[in-house]
Structure formats: structure tokens, C-alpha cells
């Protein structure tokens, strides 16, 4: 066996040594240019399948932008909203994601559609292709580009038939619209849920403070200690005024009557009775015991302040909810289709003149390089 291998190697060496550089240069054009060009032409004529492209242009805008008409003017002026640009890039990533591929495969039977590529082995998708290979094949069949000047997202889809290319693009638009709606509504729901949670907390605090106020009124058998204390103070002031007037009248009586005169005695008794009433009313207002009006008024004021504060807080949360609803509705994002996908009339791929020109250019460059290299080798031999 070893002897046979050595014989074969010796034969190959003999054949290679017999081939001169002149022979190689003589057939170099056939090897480098004609043979590859023939292979390309055979592939294009026999194996390649025509592929059709459908194209659409979309923009992501907020609902208030649409209402104000800023969509048309913004696009005409070449301006793009930073928020819309960010959303467009998010959408671009989603379109190229496995989630979008799964949705397309479910609706279009994507794997089955691209497995029927005829004899085109370069664009064939195996039914047993791995998930990674399937995703790579999908990305080769869709092109999503973002124009930062106009804020437009350009979506190009290809298929082996015009109908599939169109349906492919339409389904991408439908799933993109669902993604944008879900993303903006989810943000709005989160904001509204937070506002409603804060409102519920404020309502519970308000109910608790109201219950505390009612319990205080029931336990102390009083409606408003502050009002009662103010009424008692007003009454004491009135009685004090009456007492001062009666004392003045008594001094007037003493100018012409004796101390034991009936009018004087009666006036003194009236003043003493009035003073006793004043003392009694004052004892209701201020006293060291905790059930007096002054202490009750302080406690009541604290509880009442809690109720008023929690009431205002509850009103603020209600206002916040309404503002959140309005703001969420204003910031809802929509997918605006600027250019709808159309049914292609001509195949876009393969671009035969372009492929032939590029292939010929590459072959000629390679031919020139090898030709120069062989010439250098020939000079060194000489």
C-alpha cells in the first residue's frame, strides 16, 4: 500500500514539473474568467429563482401629533421627533426578532413557503433548519432601515412570488402596529394603575380620619368643641359687660342710698348671681381636667385638620387620575403607513446585469493579479 502511495506522489510531481508557467499563463484566462462566468451563467439560467420585493414606509407618531397636523409638516421639513426615532428603532429590533418570526411563521407558514425554492440551492430553506439558521434566513429576506432625517422606517420584504412578498409585508405591518399599540397602552396602563393605587390609599386615609372624627364626637358627646368654646367665650364676655354695667349702677345707688337699702341689697345679689354664672361658664372653657372645651378644641382641631388634609389629598389624586388619563390618551402612539406595500410586477432579484458585471470585474481583477504574479515568478527564474 505504501509503495502505491509513493508511486502516485511521484507521478503527480512528474506531471506538475511538466507544466510550465507558459502553459499556466496560456490557460489562465479560461480558468479565472471564462470558467467562473460560465458557472454564474449556468446558475442564473437554470437554478436561480426570481424573487420579488414589496416595500412600505411607516412612521411612529403620537396621537396629539396627528391631531395637530405635525405629521405632514414634520415630514415635509425633514424633522423627526427624538421619541419617535427611539420608538422606530425599537420597532426595527422587534421586526428582526424571533418573536416577529414566530408570528409570521404562524400566520404565513413561513418555513413552508420558503422551502419551495425549486432548483435554487443558494436560496433554499430546509424544513429541518435550526432556529438560529431560520432566523438568519428570515433576516436575509427582510430589510428594515431607518431614515433619521424624515423619521421614516423603510420595510422591504422578498418572496418567490409577488403575492407572498406583498402578504409578507402586510403581515409585518399588522404585527408592527400591534406591537406599537401594546407598548404604548402598557405604559398608559402602568401610569393609570399607579395613579389609581395612590387614589385608593388617599381614600382609605380619608375614611380613617373621618371615622376618627365621628368617634371623637360620639365619645365626647360634642359636635364642634371649637364652636362651643367660642360661643361660651362670647357668653362670658356678654355677662362680664352686664356685670360692669350693674356695678356702675350699684355705685350710682350708693351715692344717695344706704348700704342696707333694699335697692342696694338687690343690686349686690344680682351682681353676685351674675358672677357665679360667669365663673360657671369660665370653668367650662378652661380647667385642668381633660374634658374641658379648651382641651377638646385642641384635640378636635388636630383631628379636623387630618380630615381636611386627607380630603385635599384625595381631591389631588382624583385630579391626577384625570390628568393621567388625558396625558396617556395624548401620548398614545400609532403606526402611520406613509407608503402602503404594493404587488410587485417585476422580479427584483437576482439582478442579472449587476451580478454579471460585478462577477466579471472580480474575475478580471483576480486574473490581472495572478498574471502579474506569474510574470514576477518568470522574471526570477530567468
From Swiss-Prot:
It is found in: Cell inner membrane. One of its GO terms (molecular function) is carbohydrate:proton symporter activity. It comes from the Bacteria. The keyword Membrane applies. Involved in the translocation of the polysialic acid capsule. The keyword Oxidoreductase does not apply. GO terms for biological process: polysaccharide transport. Belongs to the BexC/CtrB/KpsE family. NCBIfam families: BexC_CtrB_KpsE (TIGR01010). The chain crosses the membrane at residues 28-48, 357-377. This is Capsule polysaccharide export inner-membrane protein KpsE. GO terms for cellular component: Gram-negative-bacterium-type cell wall; plasma membrane. Keywords: Capsule biogenesis/degradation, Cell inner membrane, Cell membrane, Membrane, Polysaccharide transport, Sugar transport, Transmembrane, Transmembrane helix, Transport. It is a multi-pass membrane protein.
